[in-house]
Curated annotation (Swiss-Prot):
NCBIfam families: PRK00024.1, radc. It comes from Streptococcus suis (strain 98HAH33). A motif (JAMM motif) lies at residues 174-187. Residues 103-225 form the MPN domain. The lineage of its organism: Bacteria, Bacillati, Bacillota, Bacilli, Lactobacillales. This is UPF0758 protein SSU98_1084.
Amino acid sequence: MYQIEFKEEAFLPRERLVEVGAERLSNQELLAIFIRTGTKKEPVSILSNKLLNRLESLAALRELSIEELQSLTGIGRVKAIEIKAMIELGKRINQSELLLNERILGSEKLGRKMIHEIGHKKQEHLVALYLNTQNQIISQKTIFIGSVNRSIAEPREILHYAVKCMATSIIIVHNHPSGSVQPSRNDLLFTENLKESCEKLGLVLLDHLIVGNKDYYSFREESDVILKFIDNIVEEVFFNLTFTVE
């Protein structure tokens, strides 16, 4: 008797998807379709609910590791891998839709896009977007992921792909895992260095964005502040050199 009830419950979300469409299903029902089956003690609906209740928000699902998923009763290694694959595929579909013939019209639109993509990352990620003469994104590359041994990307890595895809301009985006989007001294110096390197190759650095989990900072929008800061750095370096000579 139990097995018959179990099978009926497991297939119910699938039947509802066919009847009313995927967009009408709850998060629990969609997740239950991927988990597929429950255990002898708990049906799949309970398992999917337990997983969702463990999260602060649905977006936090993408942060769970395979091991963390496996720690839930009823989710083995295969199911955990399938869930991770489902999340990654969804992210790539969303990214490809945004990327397809997308034209960069402003820092805010791009900032919101990149908050969604890398704002939640626990390691620093630096992403380069390469654009054509119509300001359409023709390629997006993750150039750098922070590690214990390395925390700075090199301009040559960014420019290599620019030449390869024949881009005319570049936008750089990186996240601050701390959540603060204020640029550091290294961020400012890196931006100026990259800008000069781009100019030598006839490329335009359109913007450098810093994103957190809720907000973004645009170097282009804050250009006056950046220029003043760089001028102060140059003056400070000049003063130190003069002082050393004396």
